[in-house]
Each structure stands twice: as C-alpha cells, then as structure tokens.
Amino acid sequence: MLQSCYNFLKEQHCQKASTQKGAEAAVKPLLVPHHVVATVQEIQLQAAVGELLLLEWLAMAVMLLLLCCCLTD
C-alpha cells in the first residue's frame, strides 16, 4: 500500500513538472531579462526539491504508521 501511495504522489509530481515545462516553453519567446528567468527557475527548482522532500517525509510517516499498526496487532 505504501509503495502505491508513493508511486501515485510521484506520478502527480511528474505530471506537475511536465506542465511547468510546457508553461516555461510558452514563456520563453517573451523578452525577459536573464536574471528574472534565472530567479524564476531557481524558485521552481527549490519548490520541486521541497515537494520531493515532502513526499519522502509522507512516505516515512506512512511507513511508521503501518509499522505501529503491525506491532499493535
């Protein structure tokens, strides 16, 4: 069950990343100063890393809950 939850969340993250890449490609033709583009990309990277860390934390929390449930049975 844990693996399927993790896989679902990972798939959602990948779909979100794909959507962001599409949006980024649509914005590229606009003339934007390089430092603004770099800042936006850095923020997107930080958000993606944060989301992955959250997924790992959630997976660990689910594992601990399952472990506690197994020990009490």
Curated annotation (Swiss-Prot):
Keyword check for Membrane: yes
Principal location listed in the UniProt entry: membrane
InterPro entries named in the record: Protein_14_SARS-like
Highest rank taxon of the organism: Viruses
Residues annotated as transmembrane: 47-67
Subcellular location: Membrane
Keywords linked to the UniProt accession: Membrane, Transmembrane, Transmembrane helix
One GO CC term, this protein: membrane
Its biological purpose: May induce apoptosis in cardiomyocytes when overexpressed ex-vivo.
Entry protein name: Putative ORF9c protein
